[in-house]
Amino acid sequence: MRTYSPKPGDVTRQWHIIDAQDIVLGRLATTAANLLRGKHKAIYAPHMDMGDFVIIINADKVHLSGNKKTQKMAYRHSGFPGGLRSVRYDELLAKNPEKAVEKAIKGMIPKNTLGRQMLSKLKVYAGDQHPHAAQQPVPFEITQVAQ
């Protein structure tokens, strides 16, 4: 029996919607990254984009455990010498909560062209409204043991 190799036509993409209210940021990011990569599917292949579309709403109500809100820093670099910039996560969540969630998920996706293609299927919104009702997204429930 030969090993099954999925073809691009075999991939069926589904739309998932995740409510991030009171969900720990790391748990939200790992779940979203697995959905984007397609690791939840039986026909997963690491060399292909098998993932689904993921909509995350209420990104401004995401939870950070411990003192991470005031102590954890988000870094970015301009590419120029001395261009390292940092901001605390409480400031980042207040100013741009979508960016904080995207940054956490981006760190869990491969850093190559396939990863960039996977990230294009991620849609993050600060409020509970989104413009993707026509795609009929299926609610995805994240069950947490503790917060």
From Swiss-Prot:
A single Gene Ontology CC term: cytosolic large ribosomal subunit
UniProt entry tagged with the keyword Ribonucleoprotein: yes
InterPro entries: Ribosomal_uL13 (IPR005822), Ribosomal_uL13_bac-type (IPR005823), Ribosomal_uL13_CS (IPR023563), Ribosomal_uL13_sf (IPR036899)
Keywords noted in UniProt: Ribonucleoprotein, Ribosomal protein
Record CDD domains: Ribosomal_L13
Gene3D superfamilies to which the protein is assigned, alphabetical: Ribosomal protein L13
GO molecular function terms attached to this record: mRNA binding; structural constituent of ribosome
Listed GO biological process terms: negative regulation of translation; translation
Disulphide bridges, residue numbers: none
Function: This protein is one of the early assembly proteins of the 50S ribosomal subunit, although it is not seen to bind rRNA by itself. It is important during the early stages of 50S assembly.
Subunit architecture: Part of the 50S ribosomal subunit.
Family: Belongs to the universal ribosomal protein uL13 family.
NCBIfam families linked to this entry: rplM_bact
Protein name: Large ribosomal subunit protein uL13
Species, as recorded: Streptomyces griseus subsp. griseus (strain JCM 4626 / CBS 651.72 / NBRC 13350 / KCC S-0626 / ISP 5235)
Originating gene: rplM
